[in-house]
Amino acid sequence: MHIFTHLQNRIYKFLYRRKCKRLGLTFPLLCKAHGVKNADAQGAIAQSKAGDRLQLVHVSKENYPNNVYVYSIPLNRVLGYLDERLSQKLVKLFKKGFCIDGAIENVTGENHAVRGCNLRIFDTRVMMSDVHDFSHLHGA
């Protein structure tokens, strides 16, 4: 590896860790999906299980510039979105239009009228690294 490239990588990693610390982010992050009460999301969550792979995709909307969808890879459906505060932090860290990896930690409320899901968010981008257009997301 070229010495300049090696130095660039080390500086990038240092700045990345510093930015994570400043934003209060420690990966993997644990959180829950929001906006899951609609019938489409409930149907998708009912079919989901712990360990299912997710993508967290930043899709700016008119009144929600930091909107981050929780997208199920096996189901090809949107399960919900992240809360606004966490979304803002992730947009600051990864920049607009990011797509990062995640997984379902567990599905909650299986014996109740409304199900939910807890998420584990990673700071990697490998599960769908070849996808750049997310306009096809079902439920977005």
Q: Where do the protein language model's features map onto the residues?
A:
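Conserved active-site motif detector
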Residues: M1-A140
